[in-house]
């Protein structure tokens, strides 16, 4: 391991973290600096093939345009989600949304768990592509929660289901290298990933309450949190191990919500007045359906189109992905916003004004998203080899602790790329080779990678910026990341311990 090379490859990440967390600068300020530094490295230190300036421009130019195009797609999703929130505010329906949720439970802590964890799990299975945080964060803000806390909670809620993604893509496609090599089946990859994340969802309700309310938030709520964690844990285990990756996330989210509502109605929760949402008694302007209509439409249309369109149209999924997977999700959210506006009786003039106001708030995000994505693509590129250098150096140092390192490598990949799928595809072959040389189980090692990649989404700057933009918190990324890093550290250690136990003690011969 060449320590200088490692530090130089790591330096773009350091620039982002130190700028946002250390100097408390906005991502809008830090991201262009990180991009400039990464470009300098690509043209000089990591010009591995000794290309001329013109040749390097030719290699990097497609990566720059790819970053801009993918950034536009993310901004489009942010625009759709933020427009819905602004419509609810403009019409006053936001108060009726609070009242509707309060009818399920007037305990704000229960609302945090259902909307912050269970809804994102469902949405990840229904669509993925950043939709969970983009929908859950504005929803929590609509319920009256602090915006930065809402963002952190929504990102945390999506920290486990991202291993399965829309219809299991992250595990199915991400683990294809193991399947193609005859080392694992899709079912085995899904089962082992579920055995990691079942413990993640077990502890997340407790972390969320501490994040939102501090220690006082646990008063009278521990029985419910235990039920929510255990029921979600068991549901995820059963679906991932005995049903399949395709339905694990959506099924876990839906069943957990139903079980949670049943618990609240049949058993009840002791709610101190300070945690009670009084919105249930206010004078309504809209019915529950009308007030919630944009979100109701999304909950119906996202899974309906994701699973229904490929089922009835030949090559339907390929058609959906013509402009990239995320684009169809963008369109559905935009359509749901329009349908919601019609349901709420919003006239065209008002809708246009809301869209204009929303656009002025989210368009500057393109600079941030584009810059960070270009940094990610350059670091992933074979022309620089920066990401592979980081991963291989970590692997070379840890030796028999490689299973734990695989979790960290997965997280670092998702931190840079913004997707668990990208991280899995990037490092799967490296884990296969490492497992062979160490005489370890490649399935459990890849599961650690897969689980870590899902968790890495929690602290990814791209995801944080996008989620901040949905609730008008651009510039407050440091406040959000301080919250998410604490949660990330707890679950990362848990997953690293599980990786060692699964590989070396409990399942050394799983699938072999």
Feature-to-residue mapping (PLM):
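Alpha-helical transmembrane segments of multi-pass membrane proteins
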Residues: 109-121, 147-163, 184-205, 400-415, ...
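Hydrophobic alpha-helical transmembrane segments of multi-pass integral membrane proteins
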Residues: 107-138, 142, 366-382, 397-430
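Hydrophobic mid-bilayer segments of alpha-helices in multi-pass membrane transport proteins
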Residues: 8-17, 25-47, 75-81, 225, ...
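Interfacial loop-to-helix junctions that mark the boundaries of transmembrane helices
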Residues: 1-6, 24-30, 60-72, 187-195, ...
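Membrane-interfacial loop-to-helix junctions in multi-pass transporters
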Residues: 69-74, 101-115, 143-149, 326-329, ...
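Re-entrant/interfacial helical elements at transmembrane boundaries that shape
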Residues: 131-141, 154-155, 168-180, 208, ...
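Juxtamembrane and boundary regions of transmembrane helices in multi-pass small-molecule transporters
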Residues: 24, 163-277, 451-512
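Core transmembrane alpha-helical segments of multi-pass membrane transporters/permeases
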Residues: 58-92, 114-121, 287-308, 321-385, ...
